[in-house]
């Protein structure tokens, strides 16, 4: 069913995984949704930098909802395992080496969620989630100084259940993970000129702590890749830059300053090399829309709560997605 959505002028809120404000005049937009995949409820990552976990889990959830299998996964479980892994590593380093290590962080990439699921399994949301006021930034600082890793994680996030119960069936976290996300089920792609096309390479962005590899595709394939996946009923996990002046969660959409320009793969590469396109944020792409001028937009499920005109969703213009995509992850890319 086609839905018409309206956008009105409000102060700009520019947000990456952490949020800050800057005033900017925004054009009025009216969107018509042409294709919309089902999703789980919009969540809120709070002040953490866990967008990469929320977006990847949202993509997995939508895949199952489309198949008629309702599932709501625990971002806190994945986050806990990531923090645990970092903290344990620090415990077994000599102090002089540990001092040179990066601080414990919640930053990462969407593919790292899949790595952590493969290693530690999964829990569903009802069985394991933190209190709404839990501050991951404070927890990271405490873990940097503490040797009582499990005790601190239990106290801050919650005690881990040893098993998973779903629809009367008992699973281990590993068994549950395999029931919702098989190893190698998802493909990760990117597009840059400093590596050969159609080969995989570890993407050189600061948050790629696991040195995950991405298949390098031509830039001209970015948009068709997303469109084809959505039309076949598969969501796409989007990873990209949200630093542009016309990216506004408060208004519910993102555009480039020059939407009419014919952007090229060389423009993408230049922006990446000059740090104008950086790995800021992750969202789940779940639909296709157009505005009152007939311009195509992609509908994304965000993880910043529901306090915007579209109840937590955002519209990203096609030029924005072309220029500002760092990586895509999906089952049908």
State what each model feature region is.
Residues 46-60, 103-115, 281:
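Active-site nucleophilic cysteine motif
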Residues 72-171:
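Papain-like cysteine protease catalytic cores
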Residues 2-10:
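Sec-dependent signal peptide recognition
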Residues 37-48:
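A short glycine/serine-rich beta->alpha loop
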């Amino acid at each position: 069913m086609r839905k018409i959505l309206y956008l009105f002028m409000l102060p700009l809120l520019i947000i990456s995984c952490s949020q800050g404000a800057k005033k900017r005049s925004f054009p009025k937009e009216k969107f018509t949704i042409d294709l919309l995949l089902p999703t789980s409820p919009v969540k809120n990552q709070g002040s953490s930098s866990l967008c990469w976990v929320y977006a990847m889990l949202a993509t997995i959830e939508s895949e199952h909802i489309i198949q008629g299998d309702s599932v709501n996964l625990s971002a806190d479980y994945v986050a806990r395992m990531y923090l645990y892994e970092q903290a344990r590593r620090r415990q077994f380093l000599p102090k002089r080496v540990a001092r040179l290590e990066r601080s414990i962080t919640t930053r990462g990439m969407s593919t790292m969620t899949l790595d952590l699921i493969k290693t530690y399994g999964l829990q569903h949301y009802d069985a394991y989630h933190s209190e709404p006021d839990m501050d991951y930034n404070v927890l990271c600082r405490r873990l940097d100084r503490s040797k009582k890793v499990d005790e601190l994680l239990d106290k801050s996030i919650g005690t881990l259940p040893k098993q998973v119960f779903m629809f009367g069936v008992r699973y281990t976290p590993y068994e549950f993970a395999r029931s919702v996300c098989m190893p190698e089920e998802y493909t990760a792609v990117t597009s840059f000129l400093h590596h050969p096309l159609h080969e995989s390479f570890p993407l050189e962005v600061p948050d790629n702590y696991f040195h995950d590899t991405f298949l390098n595709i031509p830039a001209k394939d970015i948009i068709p890749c997303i469109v084809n996946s959505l039309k076949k009923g598969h969501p796409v996990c989007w990873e990209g830059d949200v630093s542009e002046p016309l990216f506004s969660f408060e208004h519910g959409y993102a555009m480039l300053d020059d939407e009419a320009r014919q952007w090229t793969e060389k423009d993408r590469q230049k922006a990446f090399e000059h740090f104008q396109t950086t790995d800021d944020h992750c969202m789940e792409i779940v639909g296709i829309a157009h505005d009152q001028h007939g311009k195509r937009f992609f509908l994304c499920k965000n993880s910043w709560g529901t306090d915007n005109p579209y109840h937590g969703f955002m519209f990203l213009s096609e030029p924005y997605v072309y220029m500002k995509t760092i990586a895509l992850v999906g089952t049908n890319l």
